[in-house]
Amino acid sequence: MAAFKERILGATGLTVGPLGLAASYGAPAEAFEEAFEKGCNYFYFGSGRHRAGMKQAVRNLCAKGRRSRMVIAIQSYARYGVLMEYFFKRNLRSMGLAQADILILGWHNRRPSPKLVARALALKEKGLCRFLGMSGHNRRLFPQMAAAGQFDLFHIRYNAAHRGAEEEAFPHLTGDSRPGIVTYTATRWGQLLNSKKMPPGEPAPAPSDCYRFALSHPAVDVCLCGPRNIDQMREAMPALELGPLGQEDMERMKRIGDYVHSHNRRF
């Protein structure tokens, strides 16, 4: 089975490893630095109180001259342009950066306000970020926003229990100028790893299987991993060498996903 290799993030031209790193769950700097040396170069700095590990990892790697190999994405949930800019710049300073590769407008299930987008595009024009992204749970919105031509990539929820993007988003984000696609919640907040939530007689999949599921879809450039510690980071890494799921394993993941979704409808 072929391993997952680095790829280009949509039309951005950025070279990315297939397994991305999310900051918010508390993993130490060592976990992120170890993953970087194994090809994980997409650093997603979202919300949460447990981001110190990634901040330190970014500082450490930049001090070693690795900045050009890193893709750093900073997300803001602010709905007002002035607040979005304030928090974005504060996050840059916290990591000792003059520029982020990507600014993400976070959790928009409706079109973000024109004023907010204009403020974000102004930051891009000033060189504080190179590309603009958007995240949200309304899958049908992404093709609409792509058609507007203002966003370079999207963060889209996708896992074995939430497969709607296969019909509502991915087929409509294609072509030479397609936006990059980064997926998140690969383990459905851990539910796809919980042996108590499995179909009767079905063992829980390995964490790496959840990341392999997402990365097996040809539309997906990067699948985010949010480790709480270095052990969880290491549990995810086999996905890179194992590569795409075979047909039998893919059907198993879908079967588990359908069961988890039908028995846990909260999300």
Which positions does each model-derived feature cover?
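Acidic-and-aromatic substrate-binding clefts and catalytic sites of carbohydrate-active enzymes
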Residues: S24-E30, F45-K55, Y77-M84, H108-P114, ...
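Alpha-helix-loop-beta-strand connector modules within alpha/beta enzyme cores
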Residues: K55-Y77, A122-G127
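Short, well-ordered coil/turn segments that N-cap beta-strands
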Residues: L14-L19, G39-Y42, R66-M70, L97-D101, ...
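N-terminal binding-site loop/beta-alpha segment at the start of enzyme catalytic domains
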Residues: M1-S68
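Alpha-helical scaffolding within the catalytic cores
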Residues: A2-R7, G53-R59, M84-R90, N138-R140, ...
